């Protein structure tokens, strides 16, 4: 039996430099069971092996895509008898949205030390329930894919632009994201396709249970169960009881984006009505569009007019919150 099981993806951005330190730390602590995978299809076998050591905490060491693949297998695989252990996430990818939401910031080794210290105590005060987004459609996969953050419309095109055009330049993450933000805003300001800018978003139809239908061209589409996201503040409605997903849609106009940005910085997003900014909560969200890209924790899916993407929340899954 191990206190902590660590599932690492050596190909994650941070692990390219950090993994030797992680290996050394695990070698110095017998109560950590370390398993490395290089491909998503290896995660099922990894979790079957990890289940045999009965860890108190499962730690995922990789980017948001690695976390998404692990959560999907953990939820559907049934590898653990009874309830699975709480999940902790190390900040070792490019965006680290999930790790950030769970209070894991800064040095991954410090975060791992914190996990190990908590695993030696009563975990109950540090366990939080998080609903996941179950995505079906937009892929031939037979079972829903699980994640915590979905981006679509102009946001998805901008993320893909950053991934394929900016990251290969080798810039620091903060600078890559800043350059991408500026170019994304420039694309909206110009209002037409340009070779050096992110692709313009395609028209979408978004249906939310109990809230109606939103249709048009949007600069920003986000569905999330995360609570901390924009400027380290809480998502609108995050203080409410669990039971629904949060949707943020911003129309493709610079004034609407500026209004949303200013409201986010001031902590007023969701508290006041803003023209061109739509905030909804729902138990089922349908996204339809002609070959419109969406990204769930970094994995690409495509909505179509005859094959909508359907999002539903899962029951709460236990996570380990590292913040004091």
Language model features: what each stretch is:
Residues 1-61, 65-77, 109-113, 119:
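ATP/NTP phosphate-donor binding region
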Residues 8-9, 92, 252:
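Cofactor-binding loop segments of dinucleotide-utilizing enzymes, especially the Rossmann-like FAD-
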Residues 13, 37, 76, 80-219:
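Catalytic core of DAGKc-family lipid kinases
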Residues 13-17, 157, 229-231:
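Short N-terminal binding/cap micro-motifs at the start of the first secondary-structure element
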Residues 21-24, 75-76, 163-166, 237-240, ...:
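Short, solvent-exposed amphipathic alpha-helical segments in soluble enzyme
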Residues 63-66, 72, 92-95, 153, ...:
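Short glycine-rich anion-binding loops that position phosphate/pyrophosphate groups of nucleotides
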Residues 208-215, 231-324:
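ATP/nucleoside-binding phosphotransfer catalytic cores, i.e., glycine-rich phosphate-binding loops
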């Amino acid at each position: 039996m191990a206190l902590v099981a660590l599932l690492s993806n050596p190909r994650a951005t941070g692990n390219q430099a950090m993994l030797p330190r992680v290996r050394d730390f695990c070698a110095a602590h017998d109560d950590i069971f370390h398993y490395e995978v290089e491909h998503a299809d290896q995660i099922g076998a990894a979790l079957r092996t990890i289940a045999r050591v009965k860890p108190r905490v499962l730690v995922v060491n990789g980017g948001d895509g690695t976390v998404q693949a692990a959560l999907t297998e953990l939820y559907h695989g049934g590898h653990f008898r009874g309830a699975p252990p709480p999940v902790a996430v190390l900040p070792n990818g490019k965006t680290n949205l999930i790790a950030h939401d769970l209070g894991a910031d800064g040095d991954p080794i410090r975060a791992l030390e914190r996990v190990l210290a908590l695993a030696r105590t009563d975990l109950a005060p540090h366990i939080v329930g998080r609903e996941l987004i179950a995505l079906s459609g937009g892929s031939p996969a037979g079972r829903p894919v699980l994640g915590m953050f979905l981006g679509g419309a102009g946001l998805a095109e901008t993320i893909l632009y950053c991934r394929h055009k900016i990251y290969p330049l080798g810039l620091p993450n903060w600078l890559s994201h800043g350059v991408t933000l500026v170019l994304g805003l420039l694309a909206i300001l110009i209002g037409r396709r340009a070779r050096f800018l992110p692709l313009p978003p395609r028209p979408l139809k978004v249906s939310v249970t109990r809230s109606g239908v939103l249709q048009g061209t949007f600069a920003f589409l986000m569905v999330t169960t995360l609570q901390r996201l924009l400027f380290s503040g809480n998502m609108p409605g995050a203080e409410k009881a669990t039971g629904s997903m949060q949707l943020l849609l911003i129309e493709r106009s610079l004034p609407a984006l500026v209004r949303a940005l200013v409201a986010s910085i001031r902590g007023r997003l969701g508290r006041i009505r803003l023209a061109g900014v739509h905030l909804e909560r729902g138990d089922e969200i349908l996204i339809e569009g002609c070959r419109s890209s969406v990204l769930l924790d970094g994995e690409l899916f495509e909505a179509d007019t005859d094959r909508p993407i359907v999002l539903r929340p899962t029951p709460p899954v236990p996570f380990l919150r590292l913040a004091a």
